[in-house]
């Protein structure tokens, strides 16, 4: 799965089992890292409406992957806590990131300075 294919998949028509289907496709393609990168990139270079769809739906798919196969997300846990959770700017994506973070803090222990960033971001949201 290429970045262009992933963006197309996230920005096209939404359907009832979207998150399950896309999460399965991403995992089967070994593209969890690519999904993580796309979702946390702030979708620079995409038209605003497309960027919002990619951020929101990508965060939804990432949440699905996290809860269905947490081990596939764990390589990104440190980065998620350190920079990507606090930097999330899309209000719709924040909802999915917050669900992941609420569970992640029971499985992963971030650095103290990262915990402060997480708390500040959550309070700001």
Language-model regions, residue ranges each:
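Alpha-helical scaffold domains
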Residues: 1-125
């Amino acid at each position: 799965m290429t970045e262009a294919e992933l963006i197309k998949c996230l920005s096209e028509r939404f359907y009832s089992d979207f998150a399950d289907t896309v999460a399965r496709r991403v995992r089967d393609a070994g593209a969890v890292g690519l999904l993580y990168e796309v979702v946390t990139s702030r979708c620079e270079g995409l038209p605003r409406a497309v960027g919002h769809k990619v951020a929101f739906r990508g965060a939804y798919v990432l949440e699905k992957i996290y809860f269905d196969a947490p081990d596939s997300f764990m390589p990104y846990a440190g980065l998620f806590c350190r920079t990507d959770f606090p930097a999330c700017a899309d209000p719709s994506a924040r909802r999915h990131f917050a669900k992941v973070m609420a569970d992640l803090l029971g499985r992963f222990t971030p650095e103290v300075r990262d915990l402060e960033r997480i708390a500040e971001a959550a309070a700001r949201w």
